[in-house]
Amino acid sequence: MLDVFIRQQATKILVGDTHQQIYGWRNAVNSLENTDFQELRLSASFRFSPQIATLAHKILLWKKHLGQEPDVKLFGRGKNTANKVKATIARTNLGLLLRAIEFIKENKNIKHIYFEGNLNSYTYADDGASLYDVLNLQNGKKRLVRDPIIKQMSSVDDLEEYIKQTDDVQLGLMLEIVKEYGNEIPKILQDLKDKHVANEDKHKAQMIFSTVHRCKGMEYDSVQLVNDFVGEERLKVMVDKDDADPSRLNEEINLLYVAVTRTRNHLYIPENLVPDGIGPTPSLHILKTEKKEKDSNTETDRAIRSYLKEKTQRSSVNEASKQSYQKWTKELDAELLQMHDEGIPTRVMSTHFNRTTGGIRSRLKKLNGW
């Protein structure tokens, strides 16, 4: 296709962003790097603010860990103050599905949501394994299991051992979803489908859900990121592995860059995905996490701990219990209400404020007069 384009007898202009190359797994190539045209920089964006531009720029500088010297100039000229269109963006299908489940279970009054792309695809891992395969294995219905790997397992215990041996993040998440919700899963998925609006009614959605691949080119007033992207600490660990794939790691950086630049106004981002030297601003909200990623934890352990509800609180429950009885200030109340209005899960707010989930719910009940 590129060859056909280049051979046209006309003035030719290629417009793109090298750092938004995220489809290498589909064997997509970056056309900008395969031509010798004169290069003109478009370094200003009128979508997002200077603070978001600085964040995005510093994320791209992580490519130095891959031996690159990114020559990037990025300026934010956006002045949007609207906060109507809200989106949750994840790196993986299952990370997004977990957040969507949390959202509708915690917000019973939500009537309309929207998924970019096919909703059914979010129940699958990248390798094709289905959430229903794991559920059928747990229920002893192996005849209904289609995935060849899961079909080899005689029980959930075998699957759990396989996950530990292979460090399969997405399969680990599937197993934990099944453990958490069990036979309630079909009803939950049906609830998601019932609330999902058609394309022409997307403007009615109270929350839009998307993986970063599906929302490339999109923009939203407010964006919250699920904590399943690769941060700098994890990137440095992955670079040092014997089987490290520089092109894949380059795309992992690009994925986070694309995700943070979807916002027109507010961005809620876990602190372990924030480069050093970046602090919160009125539009950039840094969500505290349990702790920075540690080399001693496997990817599966980190991913599972990022999503599960009460399980994520075990390591800090004693300290959180102490904090639950400390005085709330006007500033903290305002931040809590804003995060709740944005649809941030109670689990995430609990970690951010270092309080129990019960303490968060109790405070919200008082502030909202429920």
Which residues are covered by each model-predicted region?
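Short, Lys/Arg-enriched anionic-surface-contact patches
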Residues: 311-334
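Short, solvent-exposed alpha-helical "recognition" segments
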Residues: 313-316, 364-370
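Conserved helicase/translocase motor-coupling segment
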Residues: 81-208, 212
